[in-house]
Amino acid sequence: MLSHRKPTRTCLADIEDYFQQPPPQFLDLELAVCWVLACLLQNDSYPSGLLQRLQHDHPQLRLSETVLHQAVDFLERQEMLDCYTKRCPSRGRPRRMLHLHQDARDQAERLMKPWTRWLHEHAPITT
């Protein structure tokens, strides 16, 4: 039977290396909602574009498609989002674009301070 145990650390330098390059951290629903709002405060986006942007802007973080869709559904139920389709020349079918309601911007802005603080606290250690 194969073991899925992590390799043992052989010295303190290995543990230090862990903090230099920690494993990716997956966002839960609350953090995913904040990520979606942070992006949509800047401009409209399509869901897979949000995933690509997270990977680019915060490579230490991960967001599953399932949790992303739960976050979008949550925001739609809160009546904070509009959706529309946009045709892109590079794609055959139109994209489902997400747009933050103008009257939801204040609520979204209130979450940006704790979201930014969380990002700062969970940023990789650099030396």
Residue ranges and their predicted role:
Residues 40-49:
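Short capping segments at the starts of secondary-structure elements
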Residues 34-35:
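Pre-recognition alpha-helix immediately N-terminal to the DNA-recognition helix
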Residues 5-26:
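Short, Lys/Arg-enriched N-terminal segment that forms or immediately precedes the first helix
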Residues 69-76:
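Short, hydrophobic-biased segments on the C-terminal half of alpha helices
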Residues 48-60:
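DNA-recognition alpha helix
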Residues 76-93:
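Beta-hairpin "wing" of winged helix-turn-helix
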Residues 9, 103-127:
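Amphipathic alpha-helical dimerization/coiled-coil segments
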